[in-house]
C-alpha cells in the first residue's frame, strides 16, 4: 500500500495553506485481547521522539478474529528512526502489544514470495519435541531444542543428538501428530489473503516433511523444504536423509526460489522464530520475527510477538482486505 495522502495540507484561519508534510514511516499497532493501549498514547510517544503524526486510522481485522485484536496505523514523519524505534519497542514490551515501525520504501515494496519457518511459527509446537514425548524422551529432547533455537548449540550437532533419541519410534506417531496439529492463530486468514494477492507461499523447516506436507495440503503452500526422516520396517532409525535443513540451507533455498521465479530476494518476506531462521530473515526484503526467541527479536527490527499470523498481512499494507476463508 503506497502511503498516499501523506498528510495533505491544512488551512489556517487566514486561509493560508500549511506546508505539506511527507510521511516517512508507518507505525502499525496491533493490540491483542487482554491488552490495553490506546492509539493516542502511541502518538504521544512518537511525538516525544520527535516525530510528527500526520494521520491515524483504524484497520478492520478478519471477522473470525474481530474479538481478539484491534489494529491501527499511524502515518508519521520522523528523522530519528532509531530513537523512535527504541521508544516504540519499549512501549510494546510494557503493554504486551505489537508495534511495528516501517519505512515508506518498505510499505511501497511489492512482495511476491512469503517463506515461513514451521515449528513454533505456523504451528504451536516443536514437532521433534512432540515425537520425543511419544518416544518417552520428551524432557531430554525439549531442553536440547530450546537451547538450539536460542542459538546456544550448534544446530546440526544438536539435531543429530535429538534424532538419535527417537530411534525405534513407530512411524505412525508422525501421522498421528499430523492429524492433530495445533496451528497458530490467524494462519488460515493469512494464507488465504496472501494467496489471493498472487503471492507464492513456502515452508522452509528444520522439521519433518510429512508435517510440512500436511500444512501444504490444508493451507495452500506452494513449496515445501523440510527434513525427511529415515524409516525402516515402520520404525524411525534416528537419522534423516541428508542434507539437514539448517540455517544456511534455508537461506540458500530462499535465494534459489527467488532466482527460479525471476525476482530479487528484496521481493521476498521471511518469517521465523528461531536462530536457524536468522539468515533467511536477513536476506529477505522483509524479515519478521514471529513469536520469536529473545536473540531473534533482538536481531529483527520487525516483530509480531503478541498477535497472530494475520499480523503479517498488516505489515504488507492490508487495510482489511482479507480473503474469505
Where are these regions (language model features)?
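Electropositive phosphate-/nucleotide-binding environments in soluble metabolic enzymes
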Residues: 36, 82, 122-125, 138, ...
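Active-site neighborhood of HAD-like aspartate-dependent phosphohydrolases
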Residues: 39-42, 106-118, 122-153
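Cysteine/selenocysteine-centered motifs that mediate thiol-based redox chemistry or coordinate metal-sulfur cofactors
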Residues: 153-173, 177
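Non-catalytic pre-domain segments flanking phosphatase-related domains
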Residues: 2, 10-116, 324
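C-terminal cap/substrate-recognition subdomain and adjoining C-terminal extension
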Residues: 17, 21, 86, 168-169, ...
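Long, compositionally biased regulatory regions of eukaryotic proteins
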Residues: 2-3, 296
